[in-house]
Regions:
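Beta-alpha-beta core module
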Residues: 18-25, 29-31, 91-140
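Flexible hinge/capping segments at coil-to-helix
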Residues: 16-58
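A local structural motif
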Residues: 75-85, 118
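Paired acidic/hydrophobic, glycine-rich loop segments that form the ligand-binding mouth/hinge
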Residues: 1-5, 9-11, 102-107
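Conserved beta-strand scaffold positions in the cores of enzyme catalytic domains, especially
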Residues: 24, 58, 84-86, 121
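Short amphipathic alpha-helical coupling segments at ligand-binding clamshell hinges
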Residues: 49, 141-155
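Secondary-structure junction motif
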Residues: 6, 10, 50, 54-79, ...
Length: 159
């Protein structure tokens, strides 16, 4: 699977990775960004801060009742927000980003062909870095399909 590590979740994830005989392969380092609508009031900014975003709805993925916040898909999911909406799928998240001028925190990697031109990534100022990569089992080689997937991931982060 693909995941990110940062200062908040690194110790927990590295412990889990080691205990399950997995290996983390870093694909890239990224500074946090926000996905917002191209029509969002802050869309013309070169950078934004969490303080500037506080009055807009924060959208995040529902993690289920038994999942630890260390495994969250978003890097600020444990912080309280004025307006927080949890969704279960990417299409709903993007529709609410556009319809409600919401935002979500991400790596900044976006594919216009896949996501359309209505969503943009804007750098989030002063929030620390992310190490993005994938995991494999230490003692099991990737299948041919797995190798193709990893090569596609590498192409995505290089473009």
């Amino acid at each position: 699977g693909v995941l990110y590590m940062n200062d908040f979740n690194r110790v927990v994830l590295e412990k889990e990775i080691k205990s399950h005989k997995l290996v983390f392969h870093e694909l890239m380092q990224a500074e946090p960004h926000v996905f917002i609508s191209r029509k969002h009031p802050l869309a013309d900014r070169n950078k934004v801060t969490m303080n500037e975003l506080q009055d807009y709805p924060y959208l995040s993925f529902e993690q289920g009742e038994h999942n630890s916040f260390y495994y969250s898909e978003e890097i600020f999911s444990v912080e309280e927000k004025k307006k927080n909406i949890r969704v279960r799928d990417r299409a709903t998240l993007f529709n609410l980003l556009i319809g409600l001028n919401g935002f979500t925190v991400c790596s900044g990697v976006i594919d216009e062909e896949l996501n359309g031109k209505d969503i943009i990534a804007v750098p989030l100022e002063g929030e620390g870095g992310m190490h993005i990569g994938y995991i494999t089992h230490r003692n099991i080689s990737l299948s041919r399909l797995g190798e193709i997937y990893v090569e596609a991931l590498k192409r995505c982060v290089l473009t």
